[in-house]
Amino acid sequence: DRQGLTDVRIEPVPGQLTDHYDPRGKVLRVSSTVAGKPELGSSDPTNQMLGVPASTGLSVAAAAVIAHEVGHALQDRERDPWMSVRQAIVPAVQIGSGIGPWLIIGGLIFNMLGLAWIGLIAFGAAVIFTFVTLPVEIGASGKALAFVGSLGIQGEQQTGARDVLKAAAWTYVAAALTALLTFLYYLMLIAGRRD
């Protein structure tokens, strides 16, 4: 609410590290680890407030996660172009990341290089997705850094939340580099079969 996101609902979601913002439904889903705090929306009958009073005992990491997801909601409200691109390519990525490696392996095992190349192209969609995700995730963390203090986190805890947000952004950089290296590995395997 403090960020002007009155149209965003908050819902608990089972599991751990399952926190995410759904731009299609304008829903901020908070994992059961974090949602166990009744102050995170369940006490609000409209499920529209995200207020984290200092008395909640909310961990620094949980506050950072919430702030990051609110950052995504802010990106959605501002119609961030990278977020729109990411949403548009999700279907291709789901298919490509699921079948791409299998097509590559099958193509190599059965010496069907055309199939392996198709698999590499399909897997390439997942690699592109990781790089499109970078500005989205880094942007959400940047927005979260700007208002993490408004969540009732001050002093050393605020510094800790900032460190968590920066570390989270770096995990996406690592994921993108890992995807690129995996793509290059598959490329070398396929190209090496031509000899």
Located regions from the model:
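Polar-ligand-bearing catalytic/cofactor-coordination segments
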Residues: 1-97, 128-195
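Membrane-helix exit/interface motif
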Residues: 74-82, 103-114
